[in-house]
Amino acid sequence: MRDKIRLVSSAGTGYFYTTDKNKRTMPEKMEIKKFDPVVRKHVIFKEAKIK
């Protein structure tokens, strides 16, 4: 079952990506390093719920 999630920047800019993940194979919270165009750097994005 794939659920939609939101990846929020840890730089505190409020920038986020939306994606989906398979909760059966990956039950823990996702953390991935991606580009944040507001600070123009690669930072860690953490999983949050889509409101």
Curated annotation (Swiss-Prot):
It comes from Idiomarina loihiensis (strain ATCC BAA-735 / DSM 15497 / L2-TR). InterPro entries: Ribosomal_bL33, Ribosomal_bL33_CS, Ribosomal_bL33_sf, Ribosomal_zn-bd. One of its GO terms (molecular function) is structural constituent of ribosome. GO terms for cellular component: cytosolic large ribosomal subunit. Belongs to the bacterial ribosomal protein bL33 family. It holds the Pfam family Ribosomal_L33. Gene3D superfamilies: Ribosomal protein L33. This is Large ribosomal subunit protein bL33. One of its GO terms (biological process) is translation. It comes from the Bacteria. Keywords: Ribonucleoprotein, Ribosomal protein.
